[in-house]
From Swiss-Prot:
PROSITE patterns: RIBOSOMAL_L13 (PS00783). The keyword DNA repair does not apply. One of its GO terms (cellular component) is cytosolic large ribosomal subunit. This is Large ribosomal subunit protein uL13. The gene is rplM. Gene3D superfamilies: Ribosomal protein L13 (3.90.1180.10). Pfam families: Ribosomal_L13. NCBIfam families: rplM_bact (TIGR01066). Transmembrane segments: none annotated. Keywords: Ribonucleoprotein, Ribosomal protein. InterPro entries: Ribosomal_uL13, Ribosomal_uL13_bac-type, Ribosomal_uL13_CS, Ribosomal_uL13_sf. This protein is one of the early assembly proteins of the 50S ribosomal subunit, although it is not seen to bind rRNA by itself. It is important during the early stages of 50S assembly.
Length: 142
């Protein structure tokens, strides 16, 4: 029996919407990364993007455990000399809540062109509204 290998042109991708209200950040991000890669499908192939499109709503209501709200620090660099910046989880949620989920999921995806293609299928919104109703996404309970 020959091993099945998925081909990029035959992969069927579904659209799902996930509500992040009250969900733990890491547990949510691992499941999102798994579904973006396509590991939940029987036809999963490591070198082919077999994952689905995922819309995350209410990103501003995601939860963390322990003291991470004040202790977890995000760092980035502006590109200028001495341009290192930092913000706590609480400040990031106030400033740009989508980035918190995006950073968590991006770190769990493969590095390289395939990982970037998978990451592009993730759509994160701070509020309850999204602009993908035409795709008729199914509700995914995580």
């Amino acid at each position: 029996m020959k091993t099945f290998v998925a081909k990029p042109e035959t992969v069927k991708r579904d659209w799902y919407v996930v509500d992040a209200t009250g969900k733990t950040l890491g547990r949510l991000a691992t499941e999102l990364a798994r579904r973006l890669r396509g590991k939940h499908k029987a036809e999963y192939t490591p070198h082919v993007d077999t994952g689905d499109y995922i819309i995350v709503i209410n990103a501003d209501k995601v939860a963390v455990t322990g003291r991470k709200e004040t202790d977890k620090v995000y760092y980035w660099h502006t590109g200028y000399v001495g341009g290192i910046k930092q913000a706590t989880f609480k400040e990031m949620i106030a400033r740009r809540p989508e980035a918190v989920i995006e950073i968590a999921v991006k770190g769990m995806l493969p590095k390289g062109p395939l990982g970037r293609a998978m990451f592009r299928k993730l759509k994160v919104y701070a509020g309850a509204q999204h602009e993908h109703t035409a795709q008729q996404p199914q509700v995914l309970d995580i």
